[in-house]
Curated annotation (Swiss-Prot):
Keywords: ATP-binding, Ligase, Metal-binding, Nucleotide-binding, Queuosine biosynthesis, Zinc. Zn(2+) binds at C189, C198, C201, C204. PANTHER family: 7-CYANO-7-DEAZAGUANINE SYNTHASE. Binds 1 zinc ion per subunit. It comes from Yersinia enterocolitica serotype O:8 / biotype 1B (strain NCTC 13174 / 8081). This is 7-cyano-7-deazaguanine synthase.
Length: 232
């Protein structure tokens, strides 16, 4: 039986990954992390979506120690979330949570070991991202190798969105006839607003810009998606 664990935040990217995984695996488990994040409403959104979409199980882990160690505008109320216009192109933004994906992927791999899953799926992306170093393909592959050595089992880290831009990610949701669900029911906003979000933070800006481009250029974006992914 093919099993996978999806690192699931209830946002656009991880929900799109879950939708695809449910088509590709016999059994899909979700794992969500509560680290005292500013946009903590995402946890309830993730719970509801996991039920609606039909995940086999959904585990929510308390990793509050990350909040204690990692100083970020997503973990500290006294550090404001910058608007997309305030973020510098060449610097790591204040929304970066140091060590987050190191911890999340490690714990997801342990969970995968427990449920005998062959894959851990994460929605990180290097094409359209906010400059987070732990979203890079190089990082994911390096950590995957280290974890395989450390647990003595091959668990593949799968990154379906790694080389897709946001418009292509919208196209992928549309391919599975889930664009409206992704738009209205997910929570990507750093300020914790479901759907189209606050419209001001970098996450909302990237998401809205991608949707606008996709809706205006559907045939072109769908063709690009199929060329990159092999979907027919």
């Amino acid at each position: 039986m093919k099993r996978a664990v999806v690192v699931f935040s209830g946002g656009q990217d991880s929900t799109t990954c879950l939708i695809q995984a449910l088509q590709q695996y016999d059994e899909v488990h979700c794992i969500t992390f509560d680290y005292g994040q500013r946009h903590r409403a995402e946890i309830d959104v993730a719970r509801e979506l996991a039920i609606q979409l039909g995940a086999k199980a959904h585990k929510v882990l308390d990793v509050g120690m990350l909040n204690e160690l990692a100083v970020s505008s997503l973990t500290r109320d006294n550090i404001p979330v910058p608007s997309y216009s305030e973020e510098g192109e060449d610097s790591i933004p204040s929304t970066f949570v140091p060590g987050r994906n190191i911890l999340f992927l490690t714990l997801a791999a342990i969970y995968a070991y427990q449920v005998q899953a062959q894959a851990v799926i994460t929605g990180v992306c290097e094409t359209d991202f906010s400059g987070y170093p732990d979203c890079r393909d190089e990082f994911v592959k390096a950590l995957n190798h280290a974890i395989d050595l450390g647990i003595g089992r091959d668990i593949a880290f799968i990154t379906p969105l790694m080389w897709l831009d946001k418009a292509e990610t919208w196209a992928l949701a549309d391919y599975y006839q889930q664009l409206d669900r992704i738009r209205h029911d997910t929570l990507t906003c750093y300020n914790g607003i479901q759907g189209d979000g606050c419209g001001q933070c970098a996450a909302c800006h990237l998401r809205a810009k991608g949707l606008e481009f996709y809706l205006a250029n559907k045939p072109k974006v769908i063709l690009s998606l199929k060329q990159k992914t092999g979907l027919v």
